[in-house]
């Protein structure tokens, strides 16, 4: 049995005039994440974890922020494409665990919706996808409310014989 672990991380600055999207869920807040795409840090971290576990590079290699094709892109679409590429490389996704770090807004009311969206995008049952919401206890740039970060790990299993 060939198992692979991948780890992903992303952070984006909070700015006025943009919607806040995490895990494909639009969250009511006076600021949103700044980025080339919709800046969904949670989807980006999971996408990076998948690519890393499959040794396929990272999100920037596949969806560069210098490419206008991805300007304003829905990160769930990018995640689904990452899933397709990982499966094409011969891997099945076993599970995903993730953490969003944000001082504000309070994310707990949205975690189950995020989990549901992500499970659908990953082609997994929700019991194989976990989303946790944490604060940084008012420490650093995240604690000052300057941005939001996300971490993710995934486990892949190869369908190929070694």
Swiss-Prot record:
Marked site (Transition state stabilizer) residue numbers: 36, 135
Class of the enzyme per the UniProt entry, highest EC level: lyase
EC numbers for this chain: 4.6.1.12
GO terms assigned for molecular function: 2-C-methyl-D-erythritol 2,4-cyclodiphosphate synthase activity; metal ion binding
An individual GO BP term: isopentenyl diphosphate biosynthetic process, methylerythritol 4-phosphate pathway
Chain positions recorded as a divalent metal cation binding sites: 10, 12, 44
The keyword Cell cycle is assigned to this record: no
Pathway named in the protein's UniProt entry: Isoprenoid biosynthesis; isopentenyl diphosphate biosynthesis via DXP pathway; isopentenyl diphosphate from 1-deoxy-D-xylulose 5-phosphate: step 4/6
Record: residues binding 4-CDP-2-C-methyl-D-erythritol 2-phosphate: 10-12, 36-37, 58-60, 63-67, 144
Cofactor note: Binds 1 divalent metal cation per subunit.
One Pfam family hit: YgbB
Keywords from the UniProt entry: Isoprene biosynthesis, Lyase, Metal-binding
Catalytic activity: 4-CDP-2-C-methyl-D-erythritol 2-phosphate = 2-C-methyl-D-erythritol 2,4-cyclic diphosphate + CMP
CDD domains: MECDP_synthase (cd00554)
Swiss-Prot/TrEMBL cofactor(s): a divalent metal cation
Domain of life: Bacteria
Free-text function comment from the UniProt entry: Involved in the biosynthesis of isopentenyl diphosphate (IPP) and dimethylallyl diphosphate (DMAPP), two major building blocks of isoprenoid compounds. Catalyzes the conversion of 4-diphosphocytidyl-2-C-methyl-D-erythritol 2-phosphate (CDP-ME2P) to 2-C-methyl-D-erythritol 2,4-cyclodiphosphate (ME-CPP) with a corresponding release of cytidine 5-monophosphate (CMP).
Subunit annotation: Homotrimer.
Family per record: Belongs to the IspF family.
Name of the protein: 2-C-methyl-D-erythritol 2,4-cyclodiphosphate synthase
Taxonomic lineage: Bacteria, Pseudomonadati, Pseudomonadota, Betaproteobacteria, Neisseriales
């Amino acid at each position: 049995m060939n198992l692979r672990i991948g780890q992903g991380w992303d952070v984006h600055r909070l700015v006025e005039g943009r919607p806040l999207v995490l895990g494909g869920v639009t969250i009511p807040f006076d600021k949103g994440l700044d980025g080339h795409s919709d800046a969904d840090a949670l989807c980006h971290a999971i996408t990076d974890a998948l690519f890393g576990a499959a040794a396929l590079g990272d999100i920037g290699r596949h969806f560069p922020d210098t490419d206008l094709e991805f300007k304003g892109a829905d990160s769930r679409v990018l995640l689904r494409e990452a899933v397709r590429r990982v499966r094409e490389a011969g891997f099945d996704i076993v599970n995903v665990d993730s953490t969003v770090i944000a001082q504000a807004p309070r994310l707990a009311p949205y975690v189950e919706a995020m989990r549901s969206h992500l499970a659908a995008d990953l082609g997994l049952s929700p019991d194989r996808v976990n989303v946790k919401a944490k604060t940084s206890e008012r420490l650093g740039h995240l604690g000052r409310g300057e941005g939001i970060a996300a971490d993710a790990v995934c486990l892949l299993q190869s369908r190929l014989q070694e």
